[in-house]
Amino acid sequence: GPSSPYNLLYGWPNPLFSGKTTLLNTLVRNPFIFDLLIRVHIMDLHLFNESIFRRYKSNSQRIRRLSEDWFEEQMYCPACKCDNLESFQNNTPVADFYCPKCMSQFQLKSQSNPFGNRILDGAYSKMIESIHKGDQPHFFLLHYTLNDWSVLNLEVIPNYFFSESIIEKRKPLAPTARRAGWVGCNLLLSRIPEDGRIQTITDSIIHESKEVRTNWLKVSFLKNQKSPSRGWITDIMWCIKDLDKKEFTLDEIYSYKNHLAKLHPLNKNIKPKIRQQLQFLRDKKYLKFLGSGEYQLKKR
């Protein structure tokens, strides 16, 4: 009817959407389709909520609340089989949501532009401290469009892909700034290996929760690694992905020696360290050793 939330967003009547609504109603009446819809995690990609929209005047406040409300209503836990996440009642300095089953914590970052090579984050010192302690929340990156207030892309980065290698220290704020001398940081998304950016929604196409959780599980071998080791492993994973080859040689990874030396300036034995990480990735079934210095990236 005209007062339904759907029509409050799109207007009434709206022939553009009426066909889709009729089709959906028809599909739901089909027992097979209905059973399928029950068994998979169904998402509504529309962010719009009239009550939230009217409650706030600035668009920045509106989109922050709309994205948080959408996330809590629609998102599941990628780390376990829990189908809902809950928001912290009192805003924590870092995390926004948590899983009531496995207690994983998540931070949500939302923006209307596609995420580029880097994103702004908080205080540099706090970020480094959090990485060393291992209590950094997992990151969700939500990309939306204001054309129809809907989600276009959503990805999650497990916290064990966070290392000093992906943190860029920013210049201190000017003496005239309100927080003079404060030092922030950027997250260098371009330095995170592909396996560390798990796609949940891609170009408005929703990935099945089973696929998302499988991809999460495939990299969970990093979970119990300490910060310095984790940084080295993920940096080597990035080098492997950068080669963009299913099979590669040890010498090809050695070609990243200078790149790795810049990321780990205190380590003077780069080649032995490379071999150590490759051995670890072999042990974790991420790589297969073919012999004679050749490796194969296993299907993920």
Predicted feature residues:
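Short cysteine-rich clusters marking metal-coordination/redox-active sites
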Residues: 77-80, 99-102
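Short metal-binding segments enriched for Cys and/or His
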Residues: 103-122, 126-135
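Positively charged, polyanion-binding regions of nucleic-acid-associated proteins
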Residues: 227-247
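Charged low-complexity interaction tracts in eukaryotic proteins
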Residues: 272-300
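Long, low-complexity, charged/polar intrinsically disordered regions in eukaryotic proteins
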Residues: 159-231
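Short, positively charged loop/turn segments that connect secondary-structure elements
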Residues: 258-274
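Short acidic, hydrophobic short linear motifs in intrinsically disordered regions
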Residues: 246-263
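Short, flexible, mixed-charge glycine/proline-rich loop motifs
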Residues: 64-74, 87-93
